[in-house]
Amino acid sequence: MLSAALSLMYLAACGHPSSSEGSAQGTVAPQAATFPPAPAPETTGGFDGARAYKHVEQLVAIGPHPAGSEGIRRAQDYIVAQLKSFGCLVEEQDFHAPSTPVGDVAMKNIVAKIPSANPNIILYGSHYDTKRIANFVGADDAGSSTGVLLELARLLCARKNAETIWLAFFDGEEAFNPNWADPDNTYGSRQLAASLALSGDLRRVKAMILVDMVGPTNPVFRRETNSTPWLTDILWSTAARLGYGRIFVNDGAEIEDDHLSFLKRNVPAADIIDLDVPYWHTTQDTLDKVDPRTLAITGHVLIESVPELEKRVK
């Protein structure tokens, strides 16, 4: 993802492309986090930040997993196995991105589908691929949001929801080239949006909520200015009601990310992300950067906002 306001600040921090395996064999051993534990789930709407963190830990242990690599196949296996263990209906959507800077690349979107009597869909999304930088494990950028979405799936797949809910794990969000430029990005989310438009199901998607880089300590989530205002309002007002007003702030920031694939097709969408971190797209994006408390806060806002979203899209 790329922030128009922050891009110049971070371009110097971007790494350079490596082999398709992302030099997984040379990965630096991940460090354990030194943060206090996540709050008890009964204080965060049942969302367990410690469980979400364990998922991040497992994904980091795989090593680099850029699109098309052996590492990403192991990440896919892990995500699918976890979703099935929660009782979710899982759809694996294989596709090819034929025109990347490195040629044709096989990719896979993974979608957990939770049906209801109402056909309207609330779609949550996260990318799980890591940037093609040697030794880059993407603990925050790929890992944190995927961990949050897996824990959200555990809760949502076990209960009856008023609306149909899908949780999409996108491949190929990261650019293959060192810097972000269209069309070299968001391969997975663009593929899912296009396939839903082709099938006619896109009109059923009434809200799309993307999470990305939701692990740093002392996070600041700014209102993403491309996002749909009413959807951002629901998320941010929920955060304020829960006491997170100093984290979900009303300052704006423009971010290019997977949610644009749906916004461009007139689907209301919002992005929760803290890109203002010094380790973005560097090998310092390691496990010790991910705070279980931040995962719990993000998940708490997501799970508590579901009733308001269901009222809106009914």
Where on the chain are the PLM-derived regions?
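C-terminal motif of bacterial Sec signal peptides marking the signal peptidase cleavage site
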Residues: Y10-A13
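Bacterial signal peptide processing site
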Residues: G15-P17
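N-terminal capping segment at the start of a domain
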Residues: V28-R74, F86, D129-T130, P278-T286
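Active-site-adjacent substrate-binding region
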Residues: T43, A207, V214-K314
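Solvent-exposed, acidic/flexible segments
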Residues: G45-A52, H65-Q76, V105, I121, ...
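Extracytoplasmic/secreted proteins, especially bacterial periplasmic and envelope-associated proteins
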Residues: R51-Q58, R74-S85, V90, S144-E151, ...
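A non-catalytic alpha/beta surface segment that caps or lines the substrate-entry region
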Residues: K54-A117
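Acidic/histidine-rich catalytic neighborhood of metal-dependent amide-processing enzymes
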Residues: R132-T238, L242, D251-E254
